[in-house]
């Protein structure tokens, strides 16, 4: 199961980086906690390489936690808008260094604006 989770985390991260190219240069360690059935799986994600290990990430600048079922649902289509909705509704929570969180939020908002402008032109 954790091997599957590692692959899903890596695929989700690389897919989101493709949708938000401005985040690709960001070097960041993210701690990920997946809660489910009475236990918590902890992973360490290194960006931009999308390298995932099953480990406690003591050096993480950003920490993300969610239920395993929610993670599975989000990675099924791996769309930025679905991830954003999960953060807004509290199904996914992010904590950590405020500057990183604000930077990521600003970059995502600018990417959304670019997408809206593209659609408006067509």
Give, region by region, the residue ranges found by the protein language model.
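Feature captures hydrophobic
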Residues: 1-122
């Amino acid at each position: 199961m954790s091997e599957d989770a590692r692959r899903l985390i890596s695929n989700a991260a690389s897919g989101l980086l493709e949708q938000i190219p401005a985040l690709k240069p960001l070097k960041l360690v993210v701690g990920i906690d997946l809660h489910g059935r009475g236990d918590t799986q902890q992973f360490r994600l290194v960006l931009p390489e999308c390298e995932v290990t099953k480990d406690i990430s003591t050096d993480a600048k950003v920490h993300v936690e969610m239920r395993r079922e929610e993670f599975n649902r989000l990675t099924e289509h791996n769309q930025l808008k679905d991830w954003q909705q999960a953060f807004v509704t509290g199904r996914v929570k992010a904590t950590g260094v405020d500057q990183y969180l604000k930077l990521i939020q600003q970059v995502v908002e600018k990417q959304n604006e670019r997408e809206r402008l593209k659609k408006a032109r067509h």
